[in-house]
Amino acid sequence: AAVEARFPDPPVNYRTPAFEPGRTGLTSNVELQALLRGLARPGVATGGAVVKLLSLGASQSGVPVEALLLTRSVQADPDALRRDGRPTVLLIGQQHGDEPAGAEALIVLAQELVQGALRPLLERINVVILPRANPDGAQGDRRVTASGVDANRDHLLLNTPEAQAQAQLAREYRPLVVVDAHEYTVNGPYVQKFGAVQGVDAMLQYAMTANLSEFVTKAAEEWFRQPVLAS
């Protein structure tokens, strides 16, 4: 009871399957497909935004891998978006199937961009949302894809259809910013290595590979991390 008292229910309501009253499970693949199709359905009130369902093939088990494009450009094809001049932001969730928070958060974000408080953002940017990059892993609550490959380690060889789908989005929409949402355990490596738990609930980190362009690192720090912290 003492621990529960420290974590009261937040004063917000999210309209996703996982947060339905009495629900104990997360949003299923079938529910996610229906939700994305519903947001992209003709006739949905979007305040002038174009919402397009992007079909990116299927997972190794045959589950559709789908994303949403949200824009105020009249034409929603990649070439037209580049001519329009608005930068594109790509948001990716649940590359690791046992890290579901990213997918659930991106569902809410998509809803807010289409019909909620975040609609004004589309005046300035295009947004592509891939809420569940690894549907097979999500279905089985496993980190890896159906073949046992970690899709988050497959962005060079592109052996898996899940990594190929992300590469397709990057290639076609040329995002200025890519946000890849993950989770980390509380009782994990930090306890084993340091005998302590991490003191933060969220971490924001940009790529730090050795051969990365100095300009990209500088841009990530000055155009992304610092503005996020300042906000």
What does each of the following model-derived ranges do?
Residues A1-S231:
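M14 metallocarboxypeptidase catalytic domain recognition
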